[in-house]
Amino acid sequence: MRVKFAGGVGEHGRSCFLVEGETLSFLVDCGLMAGAGQPYPDLTPDEIQTLSFLFLTHSHTDHTGALPWLEEQGFSGTAFASRETLSQLKASPRRAVCLERFTPPTGLMVDWGRSGHCGGSIWYQVGLEGHSILFSGDYTEHSLAYTTDLIRNVKADLAVLDSAYGPEPQTAAEMRRELLTAAERLLTRQRSVLFPVPKFGRGLELALLLHKAWPEVPIYGDGHFLGQMVWAAHDCLWTREELRLGLSGVAPQPLPEHPPAAGICFVSDPQLRTFELEALARRFAG
């Protein structure tokens, strides 16, 4: 068996891991590193064209953004992900099957669990030719919003663990306190706070954290964020009960064009990539 780290090691973005066996080969994730000189994974045409499977841990661009490129380079295998992840992708692979319906071929073992990063996010344990590998994906045991199936007792010959924030000396609790302190400085002055967040993931966690701190302050969001709030209220597979109960009395409002007085506001684009969102951020900063 050969394992190749084709991206995502020593860099943030283009997560991609190739496993080649005697009878088949597969990828775990195929991410894009936006703005880089080489944004795509380090894969040769032969490696791509002989792939049998692609397993996706979740929908974020640094794990799935190179999917169109992969198919352009000749990938003709089958992509697998949770049903929730497949529903979140901008463009689904030509051959995509949800893991809930996947029966591995003889010689391949695939187990998976929820990784606590966002709705649909998972880790994998894959067995091939007498060896097993654990791929954690973006994994956390401390999410306020999402459920995690712990990997602590999973045994494998090789573990590929996400550690993007490994060098960060602060704990999650410390960073949350810093965020609340910064938000409080604005809210106590009757100023609104704008949070650019990914379409799927930390937005709901921030909404819960901030609502618990200031239950009287209204929450605003763009159309996508409002849809995520509705989804969270009814989902029992990926979200924690604390999230559903904590946000059960919240009636989020559509985000207005101008900053409301003392509001908690969400837009579903962490990079503020449109002129309209840049202008909105300037109005909040003014």
Task: Map each language-model feature to its residues.
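Structural motif
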Residues: C30, V197-F200, D222-H224, F266-L272
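A contiguous, basic/glycine-rich beta-loop/short-helix subdomain that forms a polymer-engagement track
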Residues: G116-C118, A232-G286
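Cysteine-dependent PTP/DSP-like catalytic domain, specifically the C-terminal lobe
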Residues: P218-W238
